[in-house]
């Protein structure tokens, strides 16, 4: 069977053009109108809803969500205080806490905004010839005075980032993946990965992230990406 060289060249050009166009797609700037109008100074981080099978996910991510927010210029209510206050009010599960009316949260804590986090992935998975620990989360920042969503975003981090795979053949890769899974599961590798996810999700330094708060020297000085 003869191969039509002209057709092959056209197909190759089409594939190359598609790849180039795909690489040139730019992320649309987030609309911060409501955020700028609200000007929140304090943030209440609610216990994240955990959709992963790992029971450690909720408090692992919650305990590491305060730092990027504080570094971005906000007062963040201490995790222990928040957890204990909810327990004293008979609320012990993230789902119940997320269902509390915003005006009630405002009344109890006096916070300007609340952060609702949903954990989509947390933990180590063994996939054929690889093993990785992945944490993926979504978040919404809600104005407790009006109930409006001020900002929303998502982020993920993985222990396999930058992993070239290495040599050793198929057997070597299988052994490496199995050993890696055992180690990562035993030492809860999900916790440091959750820290990376939190930074990517909640830092004002990332594209389309939250705006800097009033405690930051960059408050109300965001560039064009924040408009």
Functional labels for PLM-detected ranges:
Residues 33-56:
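Post-signal peptide N-terminal segment of mature Sec-exported envelope proteins
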Residues 2-13:
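Bacterial N-terminal signal peptides that target proteins for export
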Residues 52-116, 148, 152, 177, ...:
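N-terminal segment of the mature soluble domain
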Residues 94-150, 160-172, 176, 215-227:
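Surface-exposed short loop/turn segments
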